[in-house]
């Protein structure tokens, strides 16, 4: 049990544990023991029986009855139809059983008509009357047959009456008589019959169930709405009350958008009136028998006020069912011949089922011509026009295979056809377009509005403002006018006819004004010039007249939509082929399609996998046919599920629903549910309203029950629903008096319990629940609460999360549904409890001491308040005088005069004392994180943090990397810097798997630009890892093992370090092969005579024309680079000598480079000098070195000076140079050599730069093996290698001299003797002497220590084992536990484990003993700022070795990410390349890849375009955007776009101005040399005039003032500090500042928005710090944030943390 909820038991509405809820059981009061069962229904039944037996059955009976009755009805349905229910049909039944009316918007084949017919029979068998209304006579006949078939199959005796035009006269009379006498249980008629016969035949009748099939036909007579309401049982009086509510709500919307002073008063008055009327309607419904109504439609266009009567009286709104989903492959073809021939080819390749659309500019004449051409070629094709009314019918019955018609929005071929089983593809003979003469003859309203939008960017500022007003006015006026009425208005303008309707006359006036405006601006030559240059609009001149062509996007969407329809198995796939007849209009079409559909892509037709696409198209058509014939398989039925998606905010619910079309709406209590089809789901979307539960205040310790469980305390939070007073705004949890606000006494209180009841209501109806609360810990906790309280009502609940509210993101999230993350929930539980405990205790103390109930405190608030107070103190103490000078060149400088500057006189001239000018490259800033956005919004927009978060939320609803010098280990033994490994795409890495060494494949290489903080993790062995805060490391903490992000690693942790992995290098070289590897090919190779004459000479004669070939032939030599270039691969065995063509260069043989050679390399690495061709070694005794060199290079003369020994050979000198012997990097190939060669090299290094000695400490003589060098990079590589072969060591740097030491650990001395000692020559005796002294007093102790004492303490041993271990092994294990470090020798632990009993702890310890890693303690963690490249891999094992440590790859992430996904980069690419040019685009992923992404726009739409698209209705948002919304969007948009742009180059200037009385330093830029990202944002530097050293400038104006040197903080500054100091979280930054201001501890200055502490704030802070310093300190607060992160990562036990917090608080409370 993790928590207790009050009033959440599904049976008694009492308190219940989360455990019981998740088990789908009632509380312990209702049922002692939980009940288990295999299926959901079995569980519901078993619980009901158990409750009944116990006598506690209450509300559970309703759950049972709903499930049981649904099953009974489904059994009856199976008997009556032979089919089982679709998931959606099961949902509809449950709604009916609950007595709810609703609208069904479902695709073809979902069984709407069958369902209506079946439910009418079911109602009839219950003695109830039903009425089915269908659109046409054929459908009346079809429905009657359907009902008769159901009656026959079910053996049901039901009276059926119907009326249609095909009845004979006598039948009509008899049927009419039956209807008048109510001699029926079921009545079926057309909608038209209802309209004509209601008054005479049906008036005063009552139906229990009305099913309307096809809303469009029903609403042609809008009075049918009133008629249906009367038939359901409503009266004139009640319908009038509903009309009054509609009127009042319209009035409310006017006040909501207004700014009148008495606005709130008027709104409250309207609310009271509406609520009174609603209560009267509900009272009527309860007292009277009101029927149920279902309106069903695949599509619909319900408009106007009358349809709203259903909302007010029946609680639902009719949606259009119009789907915004497309499954179309959009392709284009650029014509290379006559378009007719292209169309013929396409029809031949694609087959039957094609629609051919001809653009309006080509005309109907061309369509006829094309139809005739194709008919002559043998295609069965029909032209769809007003003359050929049978064309569609012929296509449907198979007489025609293709249809051709005009590409116009209201054309029959574009809108009037819905045949998903027949239509497969669409071909466009040109781009669908609008074509206007600039004189605008016979304009239409929508085309005029479209044209106005397109040209708005080209108008003057004044004209643009007028255009925006006209556009907004006309769009607002026509919003609810049906299309046929708009046609009358358009005709009236064209013909000059009058209009009787006064409102329509007003619309006509605005339309006329708009047309005249367009005609005027289109005669402006400047506007025409700009239009001609635009890449998205076509301007053409024909017969002396100008025409504008713009894309007709609506027609393209509608026309291609014919090929892709929603049906009961998803969305059929379609294909569109567009022949491009106008490049500009085509570009415009693609751009506008991308604005509407982010996932839209237009692909060249020739690149399509046509066979695969056609296979998928035909597969879908077969499914549709099966569905239509009722033969669909159960498998497909299972694909279409009814689902409930729960989001937090109503805006988000509305936005998501609108992504998929126009949803139907249902009101459940105060909540609105949106229903829409998304192909494989009938989705109901509901908003929870955010947090619904909080800790109670009147139980346990501030809402937490504390129980003793053995040695531990258990903490159980008690939750109740949140309440909010609508009158005073007070939010609370506990009732003092039920239903009454404890603050103001109002009964107008909203309880979140109502939300829970509404959600439970819908949860019972669906097959699955998808909880889509926000993707953070708070959202996870809300999801957990929702999961818990809904679990008893449904069998399937999943969590989904999306990080941007876009259609693709939502569909992806649904596919990737998961369970609730318990670790994230645990972290949020702890965060809330800690906040409550600290807050309540400190707040009560403050209220007592200061005698004020408006005081509060929190752990995070307090240090933040302290920062503001401290800055205010600095501010008040730092006042000095300043002198502001304006110079003759316009430059303004400020001189600080100090505290005594009052009487200083300004100078007449100033002198430019220093000037530094240089070209600099400026990289853009990364995209916004939450804190950076809040800071900039505060600084530049003067917005408060809470306001910014609210604006951002409205907008949102509508690096795992290391530094370049990090060493990575490759699978072949090589060690190199990660930068080189990434750049060279080194694919095989060394990693660990199950703590054993394993080869890993690099799947992806990352190079990321970074400008931000890095964590520097310093290890006890001298290594350090510099990484982004979210980079993961394998860490051991208190015996627990796990991945920890760098920001959460702390001092005292142990990091996994590769150890004893063995060396995998196998490489051996000859001198020649090594030279080739190192790229040394400017060397002459002498070959033996036979090989040269046979293989080489013929090629020399053929390929070399210069005289040098004779030299080559005579001497039998050839440059090495030619041998390589010519591909001769068998020459090495025939090499006689190698030499360089320079004076004094002697030939040397090619020889094998064995251990002796690499030992010499080690000598040179340590103490060598490379001077041209000379190799010199400074080492004593020189004789020893000389003998080594003579041994290795017998063909060279070795010479000796007073302090050096060496030889001269340019080849070997160059080899040593390229290997990195004296400078540069040590070549990675060194560590790919055989182990004995590397060990010989290290021995050589020790023999020069090493020393072996004895250091006496308090324990006696101590052995010291040290290698000393200034080359820390080389020692780091050697250190990593030595660890891998089992030799522990540590690095140390003398900060004074910069010299590094590599010190061999005495715990690896024997391993050093085994591996390195055999190759020592010069210092062997020194080693022997020190070793013998050391071993004389110290016994050998080999191996590493494991920090596992906490785990070891949990092992179980049989009695007496301790003594047995001591006797048999000499190990006293119990002493290990006494060590503060808790470290245990690996070799001894291995022996002791043999005596332990089997347990998980034993297995864990065994895995550590056998592991290829050791554990190195973290000495400290620091942070540093870094600008530059970072690198990473994605690997098959999800880890790699960085600086020896085990590093995670590409998974860790947080909401404060700068990462940009590929989708985000594509958004930037599209905008930048189209608007600015391809040269400005430079993609950057920035931070790490993970769950979250940086704050960015979801579409390539800038602020101006966004305003236009919203104005045009193309983008529909759930709320109106304000000026501040647009300002914030613009800031986010520009920051993101610039983050993906090329660097800018500036002329940077830094100068010192001497004014005599003081100096001023200036820094800025003189000019932008290359603009780059500065096209969109200004550089973050001041613009300066160009200055020259010594220049004297006259002062033209001087001003003196006194002001503080230190600036007060803004809200943005505080948020940046919180981020920097790790106080708070992105989601709480704004709330913390808001709380401080709300409590009156801090105020904000009006103009500059600076934060000032109040007297109250200062007093409260000083009191808290004086009494509770450690409790509210910055350090403790930061530590707790890290603990929360560890809980979230599953490393820390949340109950243990709560115990520690409780103890901490109790110490202060009791004190």
Swiss-Prot record:
Residues 1160-1287 form the DOD-type homing endonuclease domain. PROSITE patterns: HELICASE_ATP_BIND_1, INTEIN_C_TER, INTEIN_ENDONUCLEASE, INTEIN_N_TER, TOPO_IA_2, TOPRIM, ZF_RG_C, ZF_RG_N. One of its GO terms (cellular component) is cytoplasm. Its EC number is 5.6.2.-. Coiled coil: none annotated. GO terms for molecular function: ATP binding; ATP hydrolysis activity; DNA binding; DNA topoisomerase type II (double strand cut, ATP-hydrolyzing) activity; endonuclease activity; reverse gyrase activity; zinc ion binding. A zinc finger (RG N-terminal-type) spans 1-39. Binds 2 zinc ions per subunit. It catalyses: ATP + H2O = ADP + phosphate + H(+). Disruption phenotype: Grows up until 90 degrees Celsius; does not grow during 49 hours at 93 degrees Celsius. Temperature sensitive growth at 85 but not 93 degrees Celsius. Loss of ATP-dependent DNA-relaxing activity, no longer positively supercoils negatively supercoiled plasmid DNA in the presence of ATP. It is found in: Cytoplasm. The active site is at 1452 (o-(5'-phospho-dna)-tyrosine intermediate). One of its GO terms (biological process) is intein-mediated protein splicing. Zn(2+) 2 binds at residues 725, 728, 741, 744. Residues 93-256 form the Helicase ATP-binding domain. Monomer. This enzyme is the only unique feature of hyperthermophilic bacteria/archaea known and seems to be essential for adaptation to life at high temperatures. It may play a role in stabilization of DNA at high temperatures. Introduction of positive supercoils requires the cooperation of both domains. The helicase-like domain probably does not directly unwind DNA, but more likely acts by driving ATP-dependent conformational changes within the whole enzyme. A beta hairpin in the 'latch' region of the N-terminal domain plays a regulatory role in the enzyme, repressing topoisomerase activity in the absence of ATP and preventing the enzyme from acting as an ATP-independent relaxing enzyme; it also helps to coordinate nucleotide hydrolysis by the ATPase domain with the supercoiling activity of the topoisomerase domain. In the N-terminal section; belongs to the DEAD box helicase family. DDVD subfamily. In the C-terminal section; belongs to the type IA topoisomerase family. This is Reverse gyrase. The gene is rgy.
């Amino acid at each position: 049990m993790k928590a207790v909820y009050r009033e959440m038991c599904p049976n008694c509405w009492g308190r219940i544990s989360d455990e019981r809820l998740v088990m789908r059981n009632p509380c312990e009061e209702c049922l002692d023991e939980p009940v288990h069962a295999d299926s959901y229904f079995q569980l519901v039944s078993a619980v009901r029986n158990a409750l009944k037996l116990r006598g506690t059955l209450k509300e559970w009976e309703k759950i049972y009855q709903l499930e049981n009755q649904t099953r009974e009805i489904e059994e009856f349905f199976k008997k009556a139809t032979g089919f089982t229910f679709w998931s959606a049909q099961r949902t509809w039944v449950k709604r009916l059983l609950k007595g709810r009316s609703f609208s069904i918007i479902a695709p073809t084949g979902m069984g709407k008509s069958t369902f209506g017919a079946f439910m009418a029979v079911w109602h009839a068998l219950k003695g109830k009357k039903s009425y089915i209304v269908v659109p046409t006579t054929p459908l009346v006949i079809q429905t009657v047959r359907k009902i008769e078939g159901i009656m026959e199959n079910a053996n049901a005796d039901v009276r059926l009456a119907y009326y249609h035009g095909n009845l004979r006269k006598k039948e009509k009379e008899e049927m009419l008589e039956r209807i008048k006498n109510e001699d029926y249980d079921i009545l079926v008629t057309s909608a038209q019959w209802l309209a004509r016969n209601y008054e005479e035949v049906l008036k005063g009748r009552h139906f229990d169930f009305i099913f309307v099939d096809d809303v469009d036909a029903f609403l042609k007579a809008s009075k049918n709405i009133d008629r249906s309401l009367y038939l359901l049982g409503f009266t004139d009086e009640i319908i009038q009350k509903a009309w009054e509510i509609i009127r009042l709500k319209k009035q409310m919307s006017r006040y909501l958008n207004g700014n009148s002073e008495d606005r709130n008063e008027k709104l409250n008055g309207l609310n009271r009136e509406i609520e009174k009327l609603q209560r009267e309607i509900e009272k009527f419904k309860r007292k009277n028998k009101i029927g149920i109504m279902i309106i069903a439609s695949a599509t619909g266009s319900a408009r106007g006020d009358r349809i709203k009567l259903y909302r007010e009286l029946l609680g639902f709104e009719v949606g259009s069912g119009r789907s915004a989903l497309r499954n179309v492959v959009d392709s284009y073809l650029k014509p290379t011949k006559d378009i007719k021939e292209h169309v013929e080819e396409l029809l031949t390749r694609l087959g039957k089922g094609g629609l051919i659309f001809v653009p309006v500019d080509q005309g109907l004449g061309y369509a006829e011509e094309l139809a005739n051409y194709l008919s002559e070629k043998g295609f069965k094709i029909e032209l769809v026009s007003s003359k050929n009314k049978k064309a569609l019918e012929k296509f449907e019955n198979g007489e025609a295979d293709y249809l051709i018609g005009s590409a116009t929005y209201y054309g029959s071929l574009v809108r009037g056809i819905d045949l998903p089983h027949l239509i497969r593809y669409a071909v466009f003979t040109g781009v669908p377009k609008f074509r206007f003469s600039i004189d605008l003859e016979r304009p239409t309203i929508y085309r005029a509005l479209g044209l106005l939008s397109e040209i708005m960017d080209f108008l003057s500022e004044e004209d643009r403002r007028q255009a925006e007003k006209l556009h907004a006015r006309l769009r607002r006026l026509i919003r609810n006018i049906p299309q046929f009425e708009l046609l009358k208005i358009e005709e009236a303008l064209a013909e000059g006819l009058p209009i009787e309707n006064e409102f329509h006359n007003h619309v006509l006036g605005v339309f006329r004004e708009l047309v005249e405006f367009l005609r005027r601006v289109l005669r402006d030559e400047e506007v025409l010039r700009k239009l001609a240059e635009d890449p998205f609009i076509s301007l053409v001149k024909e017969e002396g007249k100008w025409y504008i062509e713009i894309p007709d996007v609506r027609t393209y969407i509608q026309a291609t939509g014919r090929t892709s329809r929603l049906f009961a198995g998803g969305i059929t796939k379609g294909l569109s082929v567009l022949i491009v007849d106008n490049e500009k209009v085509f570009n415009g079409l693609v751009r506008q399609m991308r604005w509407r559909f982010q996932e839209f892509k237009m692909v060249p037709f020739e690149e399509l996998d046509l066979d695969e696409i056609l296979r998928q198209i035909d597969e879908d058509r077969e499914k549709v046919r099966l569905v239509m014939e009722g033969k669909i398989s159960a498998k497909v039925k299972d694909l279409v599920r009814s689902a409930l998606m729960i989001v937090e905010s109503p805006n988000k619910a509305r936005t998501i629903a609108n992504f998929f079309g126009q949803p139907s709406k249902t009101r459940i209590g105060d909540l609105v549910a949106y229903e829409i089809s998304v192909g494989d789901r009938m989705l109901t979307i509901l908003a929870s309203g955010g947090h619904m539960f909080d800790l109670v205040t009147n139980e346990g310790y501030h809402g937490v029950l504390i129980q003793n469980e053995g040695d531990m305390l258990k903490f159980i939070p008690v939750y109740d629903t949140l309440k909010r007073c609508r009158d005073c705004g007070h939010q609370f949890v506990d009732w003092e008096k039920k239903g009454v606000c404890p603050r103001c006494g109002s009964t107008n209180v909203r309880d979140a319990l109502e939300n829970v009841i509404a959600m439970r209501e819908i949860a019972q109806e669906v097959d699955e629940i998808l909880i889509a609360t926000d993707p953070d810990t708070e959202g996870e906790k809300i999801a957990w609460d929702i999961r818990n309280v809904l679990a008893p009502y449904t069998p399937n609940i999943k969590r989904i999360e999306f990080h941007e509210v876009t259609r693709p993101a939502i569909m992806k999230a649904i596919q990737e549904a998961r369970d609730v993350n318990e670790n994230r929930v645990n972290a949020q539980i702890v965060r809330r409890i800690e906040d409550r405990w600290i807050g309540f205790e400190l707040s009560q103390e403050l209220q007592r001491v200061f005698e004020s109930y408006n005081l509060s405190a929190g752990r995070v608030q307090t240090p933040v308040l302290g920062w503001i107070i401290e800055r205010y103190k600095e501010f008040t103490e730092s006042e000095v005088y300043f002198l502001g000078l304006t110079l003759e060149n316009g430059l303004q400088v400020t001189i600080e005069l100090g505290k005594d500057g009052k009487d200083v006189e300004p100078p007449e001239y100033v002198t430019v004392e220093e000037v530094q000018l240089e070209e600099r490259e400026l990289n853009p800033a990364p995209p916004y994180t939450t804190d950076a956005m809040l800071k900039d919004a505060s600084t530049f927009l003067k917005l408060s943090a809470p306001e910014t978060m609210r604006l951002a939320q409205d907008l949102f609803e509508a690096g795992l990397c290391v530094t370049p010098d990090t060493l990575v280990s490759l699978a072949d033994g090589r060690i190199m810097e990660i930068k080189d490994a990434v750049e060279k795409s080194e694919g095989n890495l060394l990693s660990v798997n199950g703590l054993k060494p394993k080869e890993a494949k690099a799947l992806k290489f990352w190079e990321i630009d970074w400008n931000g903080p890095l964590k520097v993790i310093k290890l006890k062995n001298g290594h350090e890892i510099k990484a982004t805060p979210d980079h993961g490391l394998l860490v051991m903490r208190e015996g627990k093992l796990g991945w920890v992000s760098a920001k959460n690693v702390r001092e005292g942790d142990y990091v996994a370090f590769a150890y004893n992995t063995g060396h995998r290098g196998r490489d051996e070289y000859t001198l020649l092969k090594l030279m080739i590897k190192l790229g040394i090919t400017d060397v002459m190779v002498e070959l033996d005579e036979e090989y040269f004459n046979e293989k080489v000479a013929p090629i020399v004669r053929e390929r070399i024309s210069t005289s040098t070939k004779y030299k080559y032939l005579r001497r039998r030599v050839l440059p090495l680079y030619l041998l390589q270039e010519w591909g001769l691969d068998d020459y090495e065995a025939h090499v006689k000598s190698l030499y360089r063509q320079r004076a004094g260069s002697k030939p040397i043989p090619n020889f094998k480079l064995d251990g002796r050679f690499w030992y010499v390399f080690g000598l040179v690495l340590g103490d060598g000098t490379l001077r041209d061709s000379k190799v010199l070694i400074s080492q004593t005794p020189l004789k020893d070195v000389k003998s080594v060199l003579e041994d290795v290079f017998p063909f060279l003369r070795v010479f000796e000076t007073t302090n050096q020994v060496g030889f001269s050979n340019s080849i070997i000198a160059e080899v040593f140079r390229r290997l990195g012997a004296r400078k540069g990097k040590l070549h990675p190939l060194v560590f790919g050599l055989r182990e004995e060669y590397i060990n010989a090299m290290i021995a050589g290094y020790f023999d020069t730069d090493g020393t072996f000695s004895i250091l006496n400490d308090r324990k006696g003589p101590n052995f010291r093996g040290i290698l000393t060098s200034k080359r820390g990079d080389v020692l780091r590589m050697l250190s990593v290698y030595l660890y891998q072969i089992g030799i522990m060591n540590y690095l140390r740097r003398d900060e004074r001299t910069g010299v590094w030491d590599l010190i061999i650990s005495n715990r690896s001395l024997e391993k050093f003797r085994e591996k390195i000692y055999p190759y020592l020559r010069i210092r062997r005796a020194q080693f022997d002497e020190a070793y013998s002294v050391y071993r004389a007093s110290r016994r050998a102790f080999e191996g590493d220590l494991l920090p596992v004492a906490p785990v070891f303490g949990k092992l179980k041993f049989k009695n007496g084992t301790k003594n047995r271990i001591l006797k048999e092994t000499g190990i006293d294990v119990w002493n290990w536990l006494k060590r503060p470090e808790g470290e245990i020798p690996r070799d001894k632990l291995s022996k002791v484990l043999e005596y332990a009993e089997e347990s998980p702890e034993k297995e864990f310890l065994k895995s550590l003993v056998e592991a290829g890693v050791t554990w190195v303690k973290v000495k400290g963690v620091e942070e540093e700022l870094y600008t530059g490249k970072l690198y990473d891999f994605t690997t098959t094992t999800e880890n790699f070795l960085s600086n020896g440590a085990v590093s995670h790859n590409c998974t860790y992430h947080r909401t404060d990410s700068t990462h940009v996904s590929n989708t985000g980069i594509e958004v930037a690419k599209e905008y930048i390349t189209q608007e600015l040019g391809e040269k400005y685009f430079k993609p950057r992923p920035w931070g790490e890849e993970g769950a979250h992404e940086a704050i960015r726009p979801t579409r390539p739409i800038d602020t101006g375009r966004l305003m236009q698209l919203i104005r045009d209705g193309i983008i529909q948002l759930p709320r109106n955007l304000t000026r501040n919304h647009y300002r914030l969007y613009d800031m986010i948009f520009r920051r993101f776009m610039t983050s993906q742009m090329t660097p800018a180059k500036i002329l940077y200037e830094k100068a010192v101005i001497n004014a005599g009385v003081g100096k001023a330093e200036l820094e800025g830029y003189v000019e932008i040399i290359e603009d780059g990202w500065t096209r969109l944002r200004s550089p973050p530097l001041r613009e300066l005039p160009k200055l020259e050293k010594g220049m004297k400038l006259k002062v033209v104006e001087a001003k003196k003032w006194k002001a503080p040197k230190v600036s007060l903080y803004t809200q943005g500054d505080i948020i940046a500090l919180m981020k920097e100091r790790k106080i708070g979280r992105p989601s709480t930054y704004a709330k913390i500042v808001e709380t401080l201001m709300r409590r009156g501890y801090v105020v904000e200055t009006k103009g500059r928005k600076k934060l000032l502490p109040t007297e109250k704030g200062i007093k409260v802070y000083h009191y808290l710090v004086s009494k509770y310093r450690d409790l509210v300190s910055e350090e403790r607060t930061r530590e707790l944030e890290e603990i929360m992160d560890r809980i979230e990562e599953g490393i820390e036990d949340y109950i243990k943390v709560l115990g520690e917090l409780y103890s901490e608080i109790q110490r202060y409370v009791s004190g």
